[in-house]
Amino acid sequence: LDEATDHVLYATLEDDMVENSRIYELRDEDGTPYVVSVLDNQRHFAGYLNQIWQLIRLSGVAVRHDRSAISANHHHYAMMLGVHDLGLTTLRPYGVADSSESSVLVLHESPKATPCDVQGMTDADMRHLMRYINTAHRRGFTHRNITQNALARLDDGTLFLCGWQNGDYASGSTNVALDKVELLSLFATVFGVERTVAAAREAWGDATLINLIPFVQKAAVPAATRALPGWDKTLLEQLRKTMSALAPEEVSESLEQVTLSRFNARSFFAITLLVIAVGVVLTQMKPNEMIKA
């Protein structure tokens, strides 16, 4: 289902990756340009279904579920303002307004963001993004969807994370850990495990990496990262092994994997088919006639 929703949901950097929005250009009477992002309830529904799927799929993880476009846009606006107030780079939101079942998010056109050439990133760039997200985490902000598409640069080359719509504030330790694992798994897929862990040791320290080991598992990695050319089934095992080497032996042996996934898509569909099969059998048995008998 994760892979399927990737084809249903589309987003652009112009409005900080609002899923399925309509984009317009606007100039005020002074000629100042703005980006106008309109999100309709009907278009937001696919994003809402994806949130619900994550809520069902993940255990012990807080997941947003914004039923309306208005709720989603208001939250996104608040997130961007909050991240900006931390001194972190974001696109500049101007305001938000609602009309019927649609919500309008207005952003300053400048500075503009462009997709980051991930292959061209340096170790310093990796450390910069790791410290960026760590600053957000210290104040309770989590992104919750760190993929290659969330990495962007401003006109002056400043590297930052975009797409805060599904993030949240007052986040718990599990969501903080998952953010870091999303970033680690992305970098490990693109740059390799050794290079990624070396950068993370400088940015976060060994203690943080050791505490992340129980969360390094497939359920924590976005489908978009698992679709990258550098991904393979052994990558997370290599990442856990390299991170475990940082811990004393007695600590490493005591670190048990946290249960994040209630079930996978295969078991979900198997349960669905089982329910359908039971329904068919019961129908064929004609329960009404059995009751009368």
Per-range role (PLM):
Residues 10-42, 186-215:
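Internal hydrophobic scaffold segments of catalytic domains
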Residues 73-90, 114-149:
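Conserved kinase catalytic-core helix
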Residues 285-292:
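Membrane-interface helix termini and inter-helical loops of multi-pass transporters
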Residues 23-26, 36, 93, 107-115, ...:
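Structured N-terminal alpha/beta-domain signature
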Residues 1-17, 30, 220-283:
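Regulatory N- and C-terminal appendages and interdomain linkers associated
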